[in-house]
């Protein structure tokens, strides 16, 4: 590994020290909690910064793995309009990522979902079962 790769790995380990990033791929439905900082002006003229969290839930239509600059694109339907938002995977603004549903798709990039709506835009769900050891009959 060269110097740049070592630097990226160190920064990734620092950024993920207090949060867990799950394994997800295109077709999965994720819920991304984003930190939003609002600036409000009080009555006496002072600025006050308030911090809140906002959830964004949608289908991952693309994932880009490029070290510290990795990102993923999430699409959701809001008030009948398609909305896409790109999140940097290791950004400090991203508070948490939760996988809601696992989808079954045969493509890495699902840009074709932009032109589909309603039932045509559905993705089959992959059911994950935990492997339980079978009881031994004696």
UniProtKB/Swiss-Prot annotation:
Keywords: Ribonucleoprotein, Ribosomal protein. One of its GO terms (biological process) is translation. The keyword Ribonucleoprotein applies. The keyword Ribonucleoprotein applies. One of its GO terms (molecular function) is structural constituent of ribosome. One of its GO terms (cellular component) is cytosolic large ribosomal subunit. This protein is located at the 30S-50S ribosomal subunit interface and may play a role in the structure and function of the aminoacyl-tRNA binding site. Belongs to the bacterial ribosomal protein bL19 family. This is Large ribosomal subunit protein bL19.
């Amino acid at each position: 590994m060269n110097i740049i790769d070592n630097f990226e790995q160190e920064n990734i380990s620092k950024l993920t020290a207090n949060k867990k990033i799950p394994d997800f791929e295109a077709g999965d439905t994720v819920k991304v909690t984003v930190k939003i900082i609002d600036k409000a002006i009080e009555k006496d003229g002072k600025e006050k910064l308030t911090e809140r969290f906002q959830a964004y839930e949608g289908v991952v239509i693309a994932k880009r793995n490029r070290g510290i600059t990795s990102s993923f694109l999430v699409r959701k339907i809001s008030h009948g309009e398609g909305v896409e938002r790109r999140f940097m995977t290791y950004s400090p603004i991203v508070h948490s990522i939760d996988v809601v549903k696992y989808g079954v798709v045969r493509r890495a990039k699902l840009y074709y979902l932009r032109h589909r709506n309603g039932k045509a835009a559905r993705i089959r769900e992959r059911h994950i079962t935990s492997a339980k050891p079978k009881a031994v009959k004696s």
